[in-house]
């Protein structure tokens, strides 16, 4: 993370030109007022070849990128390039060429050209594994009509408001159990508080949550003895993400040819993910077939099977993708949120006050409480602004379009640099400050096409509503029970492991409210 308290320009790479120049805003470009149309111009567009670029030799570019150890700092690489080239640039790394944009108005214009079947960039090692080993695919990889067919079904069972209501009684007890786990740790340490890095606990919390929503059953990941098979799944997801980065810029054909250790580890991780997900799905599938009545919501798997709108193979593929996507992503966002709260105690107290007021007004009804915590929900947006799960959002426009006065041909990969956007003072005042209130202002132009942590539109993250609910419930219970502090004051930097992760352990202090939570 960029150093809080330092001027923004001084926190960036020293070799970069100053961020702010006289009479200019943002990374080397005039700030376009919201509504003026950053992507639309009456001028004759300039050709694609004139878009600023480090050069057209992708392999030389990749060599220099690797020399600078760019793979794990690609989010800073984007910032440096926007400083150097302005609000739009193109870059070819290996065989992959992309156009990068940063201005929210340009983003809004881009999405108008995504078509009926929006396409994102497929992560090469993931796609290579599925193709080489003939694994079934869900909405993560499907295209066109096949994608839309599955997505419409999942929207009903996973994204719709009525479906989300069913998830509350499944997710709320998991958050309560996490609080109990921390209280148990406090008692074990015997110092009246718990100090530690809870990353692994958050992984288990996230897996317990997503499996409960999928299958309507608990796995016991927060108990004293953790199921070793479930832990293998969590470890495999972690390894799958971490082994992806070294393989991103290499032709997939080389993976099988050279059989490097990284590729072998990547394959082994995916094998474990598929094997465990298949096992869980089959166990709960057989269990559900034997039941005719359910006291509680039986989970997404049951409803997908009951609807008969998907083939069983497609159900399994989508369940596998949601399980794999629901561990590191949610847990990492929660870790960053706790980190930011611990560094901004005044914000933490504001959030706690809101939660306690909501508890009192809702008379303990958690469903009503969820409608009364706008600042808490804004704090999740703010965490994703500072620490987005993905550093870019990608689209292949369906037809030619003009961005920043340049003609972009149809099917060109255009990447929205959401990490860089979130750190640009042209788009966010005081961008290094953790300030959830920025999302609650009445001026909608200030947040127009800036909240992109879960993607956008019909191709946004299919697990978005689950993740938002899961994180909100978790934070409600943490704020009611603990004051969260940093063990040591200092910045934690980020590294790119396909998702943004801390470069070192984050040690937090959890101080319980021994007499119950403070009064609102």
Curated annotation (Swiss-Prot):
A cytochrome P450 monooxygenase that catalyzes the side-chain hydroxylation and cleavage of cholesterol to pregnenolone, the precursor of most steroid hormones. Catalyzes three sequential oxidation reactions of cholesterol, namely the hydroxylation at C22 followed with the hydroxylation at C20 to yield 20R,22R-hydroxycholesterol that is further cleaved between C20 and C22 to yield the C21-steroid pregnenolone and 4-methylpentanal. Mechanistically, uses molecular oxygen inserting one oxygen atom into a substrate and reducing the second into a water molecule. It is found in: Mitochondrion inner membrane. InterPro entries: CYP11_CYP27_families, Cyt_P450, Cyt_P450_CS, Cyt_P450_E_grp-I, Cyt_P450_sf. Its EC number is 1.14.15.6. One of its GO terms (molecular function) is iron ion binding. The keyword Transit peptide applies. It comes from the Eukaryota. Residues 27-47 are annotated as: Disordered. PANTHER family: CHOLESTEROL SIDE-CHAIN CLEAVAGE ENZYME, MITOCHONDRIAL, CYTOCHROME P450. It is a peripheral membrane protein. It holds the Pfam family p450. The gene is CYP11A1. The keyword Transit peptide applies. Heme binds at residue 461. It comes from Ovis aries. This is Cholesterol side-chain cleavage enzyme, mitochondrial. GO terms for biological process: C21-steroid hormone biosynthetic process; cellular response to peptide hormone stimulus; cholesterol metabolic process; cortisol metabolic process; glucocorticoid biosynthetic process. It catalyses: 6 reduced [adrenodoxin] + cholesterol + 3 O2 + 6 H(+) = 4-methylpentanal + pregnenolone + 6 oxidized [adrenodoxin] + 4 H2O; 2 reduced [adrenodoxin] + cholesterol + O2 + 2 H(+) = (22R)-hydroxycholesterol + 2 oxidized [adrenodoxin] + H2O; (22R)-hydroxycholesterol + 2 reduced [adrenodoxin] + O2 + 2 H(+) = (20R,22R)-20,22-dihydroxycholesterol + 2 oxidized [adrenodoxin] + H2O; (20R,22R)-20,22-dihydroxycholesterol + 2 reduced [adrenodoxin] + O2 + 2 H(+) = 4-methylpentanal + pregnenolone + 2 oxidized [adrenodoxin] + 2 H2O. Pathway: Lipid metabolism; C21-steroid hormone metabolism; Steroid metabolism; cholesterol metabolism. Its cofactor is heme. Belongs to the cytochrome P450 family. Residues 1-39 form a transit peptide. GO terms for cellular component: mitochondrial inner membrane. Gene3D superfamilies: Cytochrome P450.
